From Swiss-Prot:
It comes from Synechococcus elongatus (strain ATCC 33912 / PCC 7942 / FACHB-805). Residues 1-227 are annotated as: Alpha N-terminal domain (alpha-NTD). DNA-dependent RNA polymerase catalyzes the transcription of DNA into RNA using the four ribonucleoside triphosphates as substrates. Belongs to the RNA polymerase alpha chain family. InterPro entries: DNA-dir_RNA_pol_insert (IPR011262), DNA-dir_RNA_pol_RpoA/D/Rpb3 (IPR011263), DNA-dir_RpoA (IPR011773), RBP11-like (IPR036603), RNAP_asu_C (IPR011260), RNApol_insert_sf (IPR036643). This is DNA-directed RNA polymerase subunit alpha. The gene is rpoA. Its EC number is 2.7.7.6. GO terms for cellular component: cytoplasm; DNA-directed RNA polymerase complex.
Length: 309
């Protein structure tokens, strides 16, 4: 059964967000819920978007400061900047710059991002300046998916005087779906899927739906070539080096104790970890992980780069 997708309603909201309502039919009984749930999850979680991730403000080195002649404090300005909706045409991080002298009302339209970044909500309010006040800012824009909280310990690309923001990359704000009864000829055991999509304006609902469908196709594509035969492979013979207890690796007390608490007793146990896995061990920092990598290299062993699926 071949179904059709029709956009039955679309509009642009007052805040430049976009809305689209789609009808997908005919679907076999039960497929409406299956397709609707899968699309909703991907639309809300897996689509890439751009967001302002860090801000540098002239004369400011922490978020609890105030700026002479500016009505908002720095924390309020950061919250306003976080609500900027932008769309970058380049995968590389971009920098936008702003310099306004009061009296003035500062909006997103005052930020100069250059040709690589489009501001979707240029009327978005940022701050108010009194006579003689000056506001200078640099805004960093990046691509990402989902939500990224501030993580100062792992950000090596942002200068120290940039104030980081919790970044919301999701271009889709909300998704609803419902399944209705439909008819094809004499058959009434047919589903009609009605899908509603709200975006922030950086992506149209039609584009969002297309990207979500592509994500699902890519996800299921490998299942087309599943081998019928046995996929079991014999475990490799353990090498003498893999049987080395971690006591012989001459690790620091901190690294050794963390590994022991994680039930890592030998090099063979370590080989089931990637570098990223080591960083997830409680109290096991980057310095300890580098120490383990160097110790393994001394005996001719390297950690696996990724989990074997």
């Amino acid at each position: 059964m071949t179904f059709q997708v029709e956009c039955v309603e679309s509009r642009t909201e007052a805040d430049q967000g976009q809305y689209g309502r789609f009808s997908i039919e005919p679907l076999a009984r039960g497929q409406g819920t299956t397709v609707g749930n899968a699309l909703r999850r991907v639309l809300l979680s897996n689509l890439e978007g751009t967001a302002v991730t860090a801000v540098r403000i002239g004369g400011v080195n922490h978020e609890f400061a105030t700026i002479p002649g500016v009505r908002e404090d720095v924390l309020d300005i950061l919250l306003n900047v976080r609500e900027l909706v932008v769309h970058a045409h380049s995968p590389q991080p971009q920098i936008g710059r702003l310099r306004v002298v009061g009296p003035a009302t500062v909006t997103a339209a005052d930020v100069d991002f250059g040709p690589e970044v489009e501001v979707i909500n240029p009327n978005h309010y940022i701050a108010s300046l009194s006579e003689g006040a000056t506001l200078e800012m640099e805004l960093k824009v990046e691509w990402g998916t989902g939500y990224r909280a501030i993580d100062r310990s792992h950000d090596e690309t942002t200068a120290l005087d940039f104030l980081q923001l919790d970044a919301v990359f999701m271009p889709v704000r909300r998704v609803n779906y419902s399944v209705e009864d439909a008819r094809v000829g004499e058959s009434t055991a047919i589903d009609r899927l009605v899908l509603e999509v709200w975006t922030n304006g950086s992506l149209s609902p039609q584009e969002a739906l297309s990207q979500a469908a592509s994500c699902l196709v890519a996800l299921f594509e490998p299942l087309k070539n599943v081998s019928v035969g046995s996929t079991h492979t014999a475990d490799p013979e353990p090498t003498p080096e893999s049987q080395t207890p971690i006591e012989d690796l001459q690790l620091s007390v901190r690294a050794y104790n963390c590994l022991k608490r994680a039930q890592v007793n030998s090099v063979a146990d370590l080989l089931s970890y990637t570098y990223e896995d080591l960083l997830e061990i409680k109290n096991f920092g980057q310095k300890s992980a580098e120490e383990v990598v160097e110790a393994l290299e001394r005996i001719g062993i390297k950690l696996q780069e990724s989990k074997v699926s």
